[in-house]
């Protein structure tokens, strides 16, 4: 049974997250329906990351096992043909190596959070950025983010309903930069806790707005207490932009 590796892009707004839902639209459900329309096979795909409601992706990776040995280009063309009414696009398709798994073979996940930092609200990117009217100090945000890098107990930045067995994670990259009218926050790690990126982002915005100091972020991290977290950033500006497999 050949396994296909798919690179996927989607707008998260129409979906109740990536994971299949019994009665609500999902990215997983859209892709699985496209597979069935293509070859008649009912499948269960696996993904590198199960993004929440409203979270977008430009670099999600999934795999699908098919009964027939189809050319990868045929899979690519067919799935996109059956996804035209969805906010989902297959960017590439290839036959996966033996033993490769979209989730368990991943050793790096990269997220981008976009903040539109201007007075005028977004017209074209509504629902794709977090709009902040107040000028944010991105340099202070970046300085505070450096306290988050490394191996830590991230209980403060962990959603109360997170199912991860341990709150301990290693954050490899935490970077804040200004790009025109936007502030971009980049985070990279092998894996993240539920809503960890949005929790860290919302907290760093408190620093940028002058309501928190750089050292307040360090203190919040060390408190290991969810009540010490800043406001959780909305899903709108969050993107899964890449997954690494050491290849």
UniProtKB/Swiss-Prot annotation:
GO terms for biological process: tRNA pseudouridine synthesis. One of its GO terms (molecular function) is RNA binding. Belongs to the tRNA pseudouridine synthase TruA family. Substrate binds at residue 111. Homodimer. Its EC number is 5.4.99.12. SUPFAM superfamilies: Pseudouridine synthase. This is tRNA pseudouridine synthase A. The active site is at residue 52. The keyword Nucleotide-binding does not apply. The keyword tRNA processing applies. Keywords: Isomerase, tRNA processing. It comes from Caulobacter vibrioides (strain NA1000 / CB15N). It catalyses: uridine(38/39/40) in tRNA = pseudouridine(38/39/40) in tRNA. Pfam families: PseudoU_synth_1 (PF01416).
